[in-house]
């Protein structure tokens, strides 16, 4: 079991129950899923690019991503409906906890010129979205084997009802928010 999952069950639940005055353990916010999304617009011109993106995402997430396709044709971007334009993966359970641990302990500290995560990236329902500019911050990515530096979106979906609860949950996991 991942360290963060143990920490959640042993200390975070008690902390949040005390802070927000919950009457039941089931009211305590928890992380439900983490979604990683990588937009690969240049895959329209070169199909190999998508294979590299899928390989990188598989290494980072530990499971194979789903290739996302264009819903509409857009002449300005030279894409047609059904063209592969990205990939995404949804992590739940044990893989989710392991990824979160790697993200907080290893990947985020490796971001260049990092000054803390923005606390304004909550959506009003306690879910947190962040962007990563380089996939090379993850230790699973071999710098010599990448074809291009790509970014990705990371969305942490929680069962929190408000941004305050969501922030308290992520703070308990030592997320480095800006002060």
Curated annotation (Swiss-Prot):
Q: Name one Pfam family in it.
A: Ribosomal_L5_C
Q: Which cellular components does GO assign to this protein?
A: ribonucleoprotein complex; ribosome
Q: Which residues are in coiled coils?
A: none
Report whether rRNA-binding shows up as a keyword of the record.
yes
Keyword match Nucleotide-binding? no
The record's Gene Ontology biological-process terms are: translation
Which SUPFAM superfamilies does the record match to this protein?
RL5-like
Which domain of life does the UniProt lineage start with?
A: Bacteria
Q: Name one GO molecular function term.
A: tRNA binding
Q: Could you tell me the keywords of this UniProt record?
A: Ribonucleoprotein, Ribosomal protein, RNA-binding, rRNA-binding, tRNA-binding
InterPro entries noted in UniProt? Ribosomal_uL5, Ribosomal_uL5_bac-type, Ribosomal_uL5_C, Ribosomal_uL5_CS, Ribosomal_uL5_dom_sf, Ribosomal_uL5_N
**Family membership noted in the UniProt record:** Belongs to the universal ribosomal protein uL5 family.
Self-association and partners: Part of the 50S ribosomal subunit; part of the 5S rRNA/L5/L18/L25 subcomplex. Contacts the 5S rRNA and the P site tRNA. Forms a bridge to the 30S subunit in the 70S ribosome.
Q: What does this protein do?
A: This is one of the proteins that bind and probably mediate the attachment of the 5S RNA into the large ribosomal subunit, where it forms part of the central protuberance. In the 70S ribosome it contacts protein S13 of the 30S subunit (bridge B1b), connecting the 2 subunits; this bridge is implicated in subunit movement. Contacts the P site tRNA; the 5S rRNA and some of its associated proteins might help stabilize positioning of ribosome-bound tRNAs.
UniProt name for this protein: Large ribosomal subunit protein uL5
**Source organism of this protein record:** Shewanella sp. (strain ANA-3)
